[in-house]
């Protein structure tokens, strides 16, 4: 009796990143990698400016670039291409969906100011962008959260709100 073994193997075709769906996968980046990347971004900006306000402006501009891209990606992924047009809904989108995508968790609070009906605060008790950056004494007023402010500004601008932030 002669038994032949037949082996069939399926060879997966190689797919490029352009072939993957936008709705697939939410990649995670390690905290140490994120910290290194962000500290290098701050150093890059620091080497190209002379004052702390210029540095914060540069970080805000870079954050805005991230914000525009994240808005497009998350709107396609989460909302099926439909953008929110009401302020509170956009702010809740930023607090939850955007924050989870960027920092792995929601922002701690979204508060409405008592004295001004047009002022809202997104509160994060321990900001990831300030956690791993040591500020030199000569740049004591530097707040690296201006990067995140740029992201929020871009999302609000992309949602059709007038640029009158901060």
Question: Predicted regions span which residues?
Answer:
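N-terminal accessory segment detector
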Residues: 1-142
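C-terminal non-catalytic interaction appendages of large macromolecular assemblies
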Residues: 129, 138-166
């Amino acid at each position: 009796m002669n038994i032949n073994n037949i082996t069939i193997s399926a060879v997966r075709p190689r797919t490029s990143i352009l072939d993957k769906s936008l709705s697939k996968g939410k990649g995670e980046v390690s905290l140490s990698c994120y910290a290194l990347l962000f500290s290098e971004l701050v150093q890059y900006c620091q080497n190209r400016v002379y004052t702390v306000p210029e540095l914060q402006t540069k970080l805000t501009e870079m954050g805005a670039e991230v914000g525009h891209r994240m808005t497009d990606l998350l709107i396609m992924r989460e909302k099926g291409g439909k953008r929110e047009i009401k302020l509170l809904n956009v702010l809740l989108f930023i607090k939850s969906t955007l924050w989870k995508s960027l920092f792995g968790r929601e922002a701690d609070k979204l508060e409405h100011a008592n004295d001004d009906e047009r002022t809202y605060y997104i509160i994060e008790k321990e900001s990831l962008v300030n956690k791993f950056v040591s500020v030199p004494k000569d740049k004591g007023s530097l707040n690296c959260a201006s990067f995140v402010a740029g992201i929020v500004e871009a999302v609000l601008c992309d949602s059709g709100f007038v640029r009158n932030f901060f």
